């Protein structure tokens, strides 16, 4: 059974998401539709890319991932289907794929040329992405639904941590539903820079400070702050049984410094 995942900013309040799912099942009753999340902040491609990048490998090869964020077609916002690491990704060329493909290699990219069966041009997810996904789920080939893109250029749109001799300077790139502030500082970068030295993790306007890396959230008492590497091997600032983003004022793009002595 083919699997199609949905990641979108459609929300669950309106009928849009139900229309997308109904369209999938109308075209291919035997598929399985799984929501990754439909609560992406409106037009936030960074958030969508982060979420998909962190979980797509948990799905079997051949899974088709529809990513519906800023999906309206324009000259600067074309629609693509990408095969990478054995998975298919369908979405808009609005910077999303530069973020997705920054750490993986695309096997094939096509520019979708599916003809709509409706005059409505504002719901590409339903009218273009869904037919493309169902075609692939049936075992169809990519050249049937699009023209080959041979010169796709990855735009460096994602912030990278800056490493110096005695410091790593990173930033918050995502805040999860628990209020954990996830940074762009990887465990590999951290371990290469630490070299057995003591550390201070500094953030916030009053230079909040953490001096150790925890391995579990409950290593500190409730309501205490901590730093921990999550399953995705990225450093996060958290509060045991609390919301770090609110209590520590950590927002997207907030600077996080790790100083070594």
Positions of predicted regions on the chain:
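N-terminal glycine-/serine-/threonine-rich phosphate-binding loop
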Residues: 1-76
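General beta-strand structural signal in soluble alpha/beta enzymes
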Residues: 6, 33-36, 67, 89-92, ...
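Conserved active-site and cofactor/substrate-binding residues in soluble primary-metabolism enzymes
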Residues: 15, 19, 28, 43, ...
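Active-site histidine-anchored catalytic micro-motif
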Residues: 27, 44-48, 60-62, 67-69, ...
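Anionic-ligand-binding alpha/beta catalytic cores of soluble enzymes and soluble regulatory domains
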Residues: 118-185, 194-195
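A conserved acidic, glycine/proline-rich C-terminal tail/linker
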Residues: 182-249
């Amino acid at each position: 059974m083919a699997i199609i995942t949905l990641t979108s900013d459609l929300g669950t309040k309106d009928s849009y998401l139900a229309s997308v799912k109904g369209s999938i099942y109308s075209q291919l009753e035997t598929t399985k539709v799984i929501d990754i999340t439909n609560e992406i902040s409106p037009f936030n491609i960074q958030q969508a890319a982060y979420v998909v990048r962190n979980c797509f490998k948990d799905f079997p090869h051949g899974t088709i991932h529809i990513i519906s964020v800023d999906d309206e077609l324009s000259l600067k916002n074309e629609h693509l289907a990408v095969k990478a690491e054995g998975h298919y990704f369908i979405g808009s060329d609005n910077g999303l794929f530069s973020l997705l493909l920054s750490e993986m290699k695309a096997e094939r990219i096509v520019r979708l040329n599916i003809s709509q069966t409706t005059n409505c041009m504002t719901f590409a997810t339903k009218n273009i992405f869904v037919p493309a996904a169902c075609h692939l789920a049936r075992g169809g080939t990519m050249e049937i639904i699009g023209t080959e893109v041979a010169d796709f250029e990855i735009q460096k749109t994602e912030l990278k941590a800056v490493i110096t001799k005695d410091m790593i300077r990173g930033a918050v790139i995502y805040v999860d539903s628990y209020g954990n502030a996830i940074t762009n500082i990887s465990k590999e970068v951290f371990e290469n820079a630490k070299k057995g030295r003591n550390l201070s993790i500094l953030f916030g306007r009053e230079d909040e400070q953490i001096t150790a890396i925890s391995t579990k959230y409950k290593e500190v008492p409730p309501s205490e702050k901590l730093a921990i590497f999550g399953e995705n091997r990225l450093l996060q600032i958290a509060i045991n049984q609390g919301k770090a983003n609110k209590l520590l004022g950590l927002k997207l793009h907030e600077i996080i410094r790790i100083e070594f002595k």
